[in-house]
Amino acid sequence: MEKGTVKWFNNAKGFGFICPEGGGEDIFAHYSTIQMDGYRTLKAGQSVQFDVHQGPKGNHASVIVPVEVEAAVA
């Protein structure tokens, strides 16, 4: 799986884009591919892991898994 950061996500339209960690073109993200319980959404700046496949208009993310960021212990 690749890693990246959510660039933006529109809840009303159900899609957004992910910036891949290694650079390159932004990757299309659809709510139906987000792997989580309840309301499936992403937030700008959120870290995610995902698989990439070629769609008709560019790269699409599939199996999007939000990455939990552990809080630093002082």
From Swiss-Prot:
GO terms for molecular function: nucleic acid binding; protein homodimerization activity; RNA binding; single-stranded DNA binding; toxin activity. It is found in: Cytoplasm. Pfam families: CSD. Gene3D superfamilies: Nucleic acid-binding proteins (2.40.50.140). Induction: Not induced by cold-shock. Stationary-phase and starvation inducible, as well as by oxidative stress (30 mM H(2)O(2)). Repressed by MqsA and MqsRA toxin-antitoxin system. Residues 4-64 form the CSD domain. Keywords: Cytoplasm, DNA replication inhibitor, DNA-binding, RNA-binding, Toxin. InterPro entries: Cold_shock_CspA, Cold_shock_domain, CSD, CSD_CS, CSP_DNA-bd, CspD, NA-bd_OB-fold. GO terms for biological process: negative regulation of DNA replication; regulation of DNA-templated transcription; regulation of gene expression; response to starvation. Disruption phenotype: Deletion represses the production of persister cells. GO terms for cellular component: cytosol. Its main location: cytoplasm. Binds single-stranded DNA and RNA, but not double-stranded DNA, through hydrophobic interactions without sequence specificity, resulting in a packed structure. Inhibits DNA replication at both initiation and elongation steps, most probably by binding to the opened, single-stranded regions at replication forks. Plays a regulatory role in chromosomal replication in nutrient-depleted cells. Involved in persister cell formation, acting downstream of mRNA interferase (toxin) MqsR. Overproduction is toxic. Homodimer. NCBIfam families: cspD, PRK09937.1, PRK14998.1. This is Cold shock-like protein CspD. It comes from Escherichia coli (strain K12).
